[in-house]
Amino acid sequence: MRYAELQVTTHFSFLRAASSAEELFATARLMGIEALGVVDRNSLAGIVRALEASRATGLRLVVGCRLDLQDGMSILVYPTDRAAYSRLTRLLTLGKGRGGKANCIIHFDDVALYAEGLIGILVPDLADEVCAVQLRKIAEVFGDRAYVSLCLRRRPNDQLQLHELTNLAVKHRVKTIVTNDVLFHEHGRRQLQDVVTCIRTGMTIDDVGFERERHADRYLKPPEEMARLFPAYPEALARTMEIVERCRFSLEELVYQYPEEALILGMTAQQSLQHYTWEGVRARYPEGLPTHVEKTIRHELALIETMKYAPYFLTVFSIVRYARSQGILCQGRGSAANSAVCYVLGITSIDPETNDLLFERFVSQERDEPPDIDVDFEHERREEVIQWIYKTYGHDKAALCSTVTRYRAKGAIRDVGKALDLPEDLIRTLSSGIWSWSETVGERQVRELGLNPDDRRLTLTLRLAQQLMGAPRNLSQHPGGFVLTHDRLDDLVPIEPATMADRQVIEWDKDDIEALKFLKVDVLALGMLTCMAKAFALISEHKHEDIDLATIPQEDPATYAMIRKADTLGTFQIESRAQMSMLPRMKPRTFYDLVIQVAIVRPGPIQGDMVHPYLRRREGKEKVEYPTPELEAVLHKTLGVPLFQESAMRVAMVCAGFTGGEADQLRKSMATFKFTGGVSRFKDKLVNGMIRNGYTKEFAEKTFSQLEGFGSYGFPESHAASFALIAYASNYIKCYFPDVFCAALLNSQPMGFYAPAQIVRDAREHGVEVRPICINRSRWDCMLEPIDGSGGHAVRLGMRLVRGLATADAARIVAARADEPFTSVDDMWRRSGVPVASLVELAEADAFLPSLSLERRDALWAIKALRDEPLPLFTAAADREARAIAEQEEPEVELRQMTDGQNVVEDYSHTGLTLREHPLRFMRDDLAKRRIVTCAQAMTAHDGQWLMAAGLVLVRQRPGSAKGVMFITIEDETGIANIVVWPKLFERSRRVVLGASMMAINGRIQREGEVVHLVAQQLFDLSADLSSLAERDGAFRPPTGRGDEFAHGSPGSADSRGKAPPGVRARDILVPDLHIDTLKIKSRNFQ
């Protein structure tokens, strides 16, 4: 018999189902089910994934949605045509607008207003009077499109319920239809279904009760089984196919229309684009346009006209022009940097005159996919650009894409463990043993953690957590991907308010809109642009030089000399340990060397085995040979090694006769070959084409395997060049203005790879004087102060580094001392009006010492005498005398001051850094007795020497391309050391590697040129020694840099559901009309 399952919930109903659309469609196809109706709850978030699963299996998708109404009524709705679909998306947008983030409030009256063209299936609970009222309503609204679901609930008298429900349906002239209310694709997912129910409801498996499914029957069943279960209702079974026939709407009917962007009255979008392009040519090439660049621009304009992309280019041009008019630094990157048109419009900075661009990497007629222009803005000012877009295009036509937050290993173990009621300390132990968000925990790791692998709940937790990994947890907003439309955006997709004010998000992510060929504009944030903007402002103010990204001197020898020494901490892109290790081997001397440097430390070139051949050829250890002049023309700049995606495309075009579009299809298939196997269809064409052009079969196959090896991670040359521009500029500032660079970098946190402690240490090593936070001299930001008699400048640390201090309180302090500095704690308190709690934060940061000579404990003792509301009698007297009076002053008390070690611990605890001695300086004698050398001694030791070094753990990295090798950076009072931990040692010492804040390493020095590593053989946790530094109960954990993948998550994969790491507390905002001085803030006791 023919049957379609029309009530299928995927895991995009977020913790209400346990299977993906891919699993459901694949299973349904094997069972002979003809179509699936996907009805996620109050959402279309997973419908595009269902469309792709439908395309992959050839099974029909019926687009639908389950509406859970406020009165308790539930209706399955399916649009029969395009107009009905738009009414559904508008209805969902209405409900989400009322409900706010992750909620949807819809009433039956709303459904009645939007019901035209929708098929409605009532999902009843019992055949009672409530059901009768609901049937009457649905019959009135939906007419002949009204149905009622017959579904086995596995409760007493199920068959009697079905019989009575059928009678009620006949009475109200509503047709019956059989559904199975599918929540998972196969019986084995039942336990996971119960667990996600527990997670959603916040209960454990022991007390969830009737919230869980009462039976294990919510899986897909073949048509024959459904006929056996509903023998008395053959018509209701047959009607499933009736609804499939009536619902002819497909998501592929959605026609995306980009906003019309003419900009110039009387001109079309294409004419406007051409006008601005040739206007930009005059600005970019004042001495005349080179012939080959003109040819490139005309080629691009013609292709843009053919593809009808002119409005898109004009939109990005408008956004960039607005940002520049507001003094906001921005730069385009990615494949868009292959466009000469983007360059002359000022969107990108890669000059086609000096760079060999490949436009087909960006826009290809054969590919027929929308272009993707990524533009980076200062991360502190990007919100101005976002709000301008909303204001310009309207909230009804502009919204951000969503991002799907999925379960990774840590989050899965945490949530499943709570659902199964594991003890919190056991969950914490399991989670702490995981390196990355995607790593699994097996029996071996369980034993290493000292746990019992035979414990049933523990074993079940690990198994179910493995099943949960990859499942969607919730939707969040994309970093900056805007979808803009000509007509109403909610005609295409539901829109919901974002958590942030004045933002809204569509329910689809970037992969969904790409599948439907929607255009998006990426308005991204880049911290280094904020840093550069602040650096330029400081240089102008204090050095009286006006420079910007465009006027920084190019190919500066001193800058490249600094880069070759790997003196790049804090700079852009080349500050990681892997990049620093490569710099002395690459020895960049030109801008193109820097482009290669940015791209070469990537998984693609490493997995394609291209790094070592390139380095050997660069060092003259291997001869560069080109079989033909054509190949030499393509690869001569990279010494015969195809390091970039454009290189692979040009090899295919020049050596195998591919067109530009075919070469881009090859690139894209290489990027997905691991998942689809699509690259194999190009192998014969590439190999045979190269053989026809005179290459040997062996060389052709080697070329293909090389391209295949790196294709999935290949880096576009244009993207590398865009990043190299900023990398060079940041290094130039560091080279010539190290004081400015330090201040700007600290003022732009959080960003980059390293914590403020390492940034300050590096600046001091470059001769920069760094001055402490001071209540009379520090502003919110770090500033430059003149050094008497030298003409130089020192960096004064700003109050932004004081943990817990509010921005508004800092502003009041600065304003209050404008006329004269504070003379005492009481004077500061009275004049600034900040709450006592803020004074405590400043005292704990030792901010009273520089100008008032008050040690921490003295300042805290003085603050303890203050009240947020002074006694009225004393206040009046003090105001009259314009000074503190004797009755307000505390008697002098001599306190025992903190030790140097205690002060260092307090510095780290309250500012994240110290200007005193390094913590290990206090431990050096003890370490020396154990024959532990300094980091400086270790890094200058000869090759092969065995030694033991120790230091604070700054960074732990385990790149996916490094085959499990761990790279650790440690620091002591003499500098840093780079540690290599092989996979076997990592597994043996996992708890030390992941848990130690201070570590000792016994190993052997490995020296290759200027690159030095300590290859670990044994690891020891010295965190207890570090904690004893302050002789206190709490463990002292110095802050790690943002590049530490264990403390801060794997790059790009942070688990957003985890608790925020300890650090700077949320700051408030200074609102002039908010009389914050009237708020009562309880002061804190210091004991």
From Swiss-Prot:
Q: Please list where the region (Disordered) is annotated.
A: 1033-1064
Q: What is its EC number?
A: 2.7.7.7
Which GO BP terms, alphabetically? DNA repair; DNA replication; SOS response
> What InterPro entries does the record point to?
DNA_pol3_alpha_NTPase_dom, DNA_pol3_finger, DnaE2, DnaE2/DnaE/PolC, DNAPol_HHH, NA-bd_OB_tRNA, PHP_dom, Pol/His_phosphatase_N
Which keywords has UniProt assigned to this entry? Answer: Cytoplasm, DNA damage, DNA repair, DNA replication, DNA-directed DNA polymerase, Nucleotidyltransferase, Plasmid, Transferase
The protein's superkingdom reads Bacteria
Matching entries from Pfam families are given as: DNA_pol3_alpha, DNA_pol3_finger, HHH_6, PHP, tRNA_anti-codon
Identify which top EC class this enzyme belongs to: transferase
Q: What family is reported? A: Belongs to the DNA polymerase type-C family. DnaE2 subfamily.
The protein's matches in PANTHER family, at most eight in alphabetical order, are given as: DNA POLYMERASE III SUBUNIT ALPHA, ERROR-PRONE DNA POLYMERASE
The entry's protein name is: Error-prone DNA polymerase 2
State the species of origin.
Rhizobium meliloti (strain 1021) (Ensifer meliloti)
The lineage, from the top, is: Bacteria, Pseudomonadati, Pseudomonadota, Alphaproteobacteria, Hyphomicrobiales
Q: Which gene encodes it?
A: dnaE2-2
